């Protein structure tokens, strides 16, 4: 069951947003006669974010301080030691680590400019009242110290690359991420790369596509495999070309070039010779990634909401999601992930509701009655913005992107 990990996430992925060491957290969990719950994006963090951000907004109002100024003064920044984590382990003392790459300040400032924070909006209809709000958010990139990913990269005799990745693409675009990593390291076109993923019969072990681990863990394993394969390619090329390894480099569209003599050897020629008795056999590399380092994505979500005080109708007029995902490997899909996750967040904040009878039986267990938001209920002005920072641990500086976007709608 999830009775410990979910409520612990509601604090461990919210409280570290603030530079405050004087914190306390207590929780109680209850077993109820209701349908069992499974893991879902956010995994406790949306609830904790809602509680913390609402408390901070109310505190700012009580103190007569602009919420923006309060947040900018107190949010964490790169290098700040997160002492709070010591008390947020699950059944044991947590590890204290510093904040890594963090685009939080830029996200807040840029978002406030976009939504014109401080400017009061007034509707021409007196029944409609308009308000603005925002929330800081954070999540994780897999589970450091627990997650484990592996990948195998090999050069085929036709000069193409096959990557066997244990990470499963659940619609997140992980296969494309993996292919882009191969293309970048080995300098080959995307159409000469085949990704085989999530197949336990042919792929190496991967803990799983959960907890925002795909790009960070599976991607890093693919990166490691490709780096090793690159070294093998250089070594085999030096043998076949009669060159020193230090004089060789790989270049697009998949060939080895001698800076000293100008000789060129294509991957096709290299691999064909290596597997035809004139070399040292097929080049296959195995990459493994485990880490205790934590690469946390940060963000700020902004909303402008209109409420009809006579009928209770709610309209989300504007929603701006600004997120630091490190250096995104696939920016187009990253933005799409943000839009989708924000809509889910708006859904469980405003529309969705499990109606239970006195025996705990769900009365609206279908998509018609449950209340999933429709396309016409999307914000009228809806924008996702990537805050570009470089992360020291992610593949090519990337961090996770989608799950964090479930956390901001309710408090914003």
In which residue ranges do the predicted regions lie?
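Domain-wide signal for the mature, well-folded portions of proteins, strongly enriched
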Residues: 66, 74, 290-292
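Gly/Pro-rich active-site capping loops and adjacent beta-alpha segments
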Residues: 1-48, 125-412
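Accessory "access/gating" subregions that flank catalytic or transport cores
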Residues: 72-154, 364, 372
């Amino acid at each position: 069951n999830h009775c410990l990990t979910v409520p612990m996430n509601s604090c461990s992925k919210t409280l570290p947003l603030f530079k405050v060491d004087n914190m306390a957290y207590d929780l109680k969990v209850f077993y109820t006669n209701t349908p069992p719950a499974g893991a879902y994006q956010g995994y406790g963090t949306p609830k904790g974010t809602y509680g913390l951000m609402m408390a901070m907004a109310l505190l700012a109002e009580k103190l007569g301080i602009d919420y923006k100024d309060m947040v900018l003064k107190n949010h964490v920044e790169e290098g700040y030691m997160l002492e709070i984590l010591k008390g947020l382990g699950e059944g044991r003392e947590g590890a204290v680590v510093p904040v890594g790459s963090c685009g939080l300040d830029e996200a807040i400032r840029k978002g406030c400019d976009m939504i014109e924070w401080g400017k009061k909006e007034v509707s021409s209809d007196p029944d409609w009242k308009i308000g603005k709000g925002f929330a800081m958010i954070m999540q994780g990139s897999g589970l450091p110290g627990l997650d484990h990913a592996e990948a195998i990269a090999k050069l085929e005799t036709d000069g193409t690359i096959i990557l066997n990745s244990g990470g499963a693409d659940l619609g997140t675009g992980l296969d494309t991420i993996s292919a882009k990593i191969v293309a970048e390291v080995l300098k080959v076109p995307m159409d000469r790369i085949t990704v085989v993923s999530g197949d336990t019969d042919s792929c190496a072990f991967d803990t799983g596509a959960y907890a925002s681990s795909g790009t960070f863990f599976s991607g890093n394993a693919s990166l490691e495999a490709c780096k090793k394969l690159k070294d093998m390619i250089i070594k085999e090329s030096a043998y076949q070309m009669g060159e020193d390894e230090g004089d060789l480099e790989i270049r697009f569209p998949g060939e080895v070039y001698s800076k000293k003599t100008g000789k060129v050897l294509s991957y096709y020629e290299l691999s064909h010779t290596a597997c035809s008795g004139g070399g040292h056999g097929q080049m296959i590399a195995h990459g493994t990634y485990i880490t205790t380092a934590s690469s946390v994505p940060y963000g700020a979500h902004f909303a402008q909401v209109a409420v009809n005080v006579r009928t209770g109708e709610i309209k989300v007029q504007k929603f701006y999601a600004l997120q630091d995902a490190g250096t995104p490997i696939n920016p187009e899909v990253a933005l799409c992930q943000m839009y989708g996750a924000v809509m889910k967040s708006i859904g469980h904040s405003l529309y969705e509701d499990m109606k239970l009878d006195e025996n705990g039986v769900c009365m609206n267990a279908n998509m018609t009655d449950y209340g999933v938001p429709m396309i016409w209920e999307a914000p009228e002005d809806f924008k996702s913005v990537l805050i570009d920072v470089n992360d020291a641990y992610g593949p090519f500086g990337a961090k996770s992107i989608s799950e964090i976007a479930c956390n901001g709608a309710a408090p914003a």
